[in-house]
Structure formats: C-alpha cells, structure tokens
Amino acid sequence: PWQKGIDDPDCIATRDAMVDVIRFWLEHGCDGFRVDMAASLVKKDDPDKSGTSHVWKYIFDRVRRDYPEAAFVAEWSNPPQAADAGFDMDFYLNEKGNGYSTLLRDYGNHKDEDHSFFKKNAKGDVTSFVEEFQKYYDKTKGRTYISLLTCNHDTIRAKETLDDEEIKIAFATIFTMPGVPFLYYGDEIGMRYEHLRTKEGGYFRTGSRTPMQWTAGKNLGFSEGCADSLYLPVDPSDDAPT
C-alpha cells in the first residue's frame, strides 16, 4: 500500500526526470550508461519483471529518439529480461549457484573447498555454466549482448585463489565467448584482493575496491596526496603489480 502504481502521475514525473538526466549527459558527450540494480525499479514486481521492463521501455523510447547509438549496460544478471526491457548488454554476474560462479569462484565461504573450473586439480565442472550460458544466448541472440566480466566491485578478485596461468586461461575464455566482455580495472596487471576492514558497507567487497596501481611511485601512481588521505590503501607489498 505504500507504493504508488507505476503509471501514477508522480511516478511518470520521476521517469521523465530520469530521461532528462540521461539526455543531459549524452548531450555532453557520454556514450551511454551502466545501470546499477537495473532490475529493481519496481518493488514486489512479478517474476518476469514486467513493471520494471515497462519503466525502462518508457525511458528508452524517449532517449533513443535522439540518441539511437547510446549504449546501455544493465546490472540485471538475466539477459533475456534485460533484453525485453531494452538494454544493449547485461552483466552475467557472479551469483551463488549460477553457472558463472562455477568458473572462477566456486568456493563459497571455504576456499579450501574450491571447485572452480579454472583452478587446476579442483575437479570443477563447467556443465552448469555451459547450459545456462547457452540458454541465455539462445534467448538473446540478435537482441542484446551477454557481458561476462573478470570481476567487479562486488566480487573478490580472481587473483585471490587462481595463479597467473589459471587467470590467463580464464580471462582468455571470457574474452573469446560471444558477447561483450568487461575487464575490471587492475585485473589486467594482476591486482590483488586486499584483506581490509569493511568501509561504508563494503564488507568483503572492500578488498576489491582499492585504488588503481598505475606506477611504482608514490601511492602507486594513484595520488600525490598523503597515504592516509586515500579512501582505501594501495597494495603495500614490495612486489605490488603496476
């Protein structure tokens, strides 16, 4: 009862405001948007996310009239639903129990019980990933792109459990699968997952959000400021990758 209907005048006004914000940035040269939690616009939506899809279609219909080449990437982790809503790409996220989670991070809370497919001698099984990816691909081919990612700000870096050779094979696979792959900053140089105390609700994710390591200089090239002024510390190791 606390939520107004999706076509209530106030809700439509909110949608129009979203359109204005998107148009503003596209007018200033942005190529598109990555949308966080794109599937969660309408609370208590049905399983098909028809309400949320309705809202996005309204928005895209107005934006694409003048910006048909703008790219929109969803953090939805359900490519068929994201395609129905009008997105160009959708992240296939590392979520417990899905196919992607079996590739690099199939260890739950116990890394000594790691069964990741790309980890040597872990006896991992790629079947669930292949079957789920094929299902998504068959339903989205020609409509939207599946985006596999090496990591993101909500996921432990692969470097935490995979060695360099395992990572090379894993990333080569990600970058040769159908779709649009995404490389998380720092993964290209082998940035490590840092074991840090949670900050601002980051919890375990905090260790994947440390500054980019550009050079071997002060603060690994991220800032000329004092080290204790950084939002999170850089890798303190003598062999920190840059």
Predicted regions and their residues:
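Loop/helix patches that line or flank the sugar-binding groove of alpha-linked glycan CAZymes
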Residues: R64, N78, G86, D112, ...
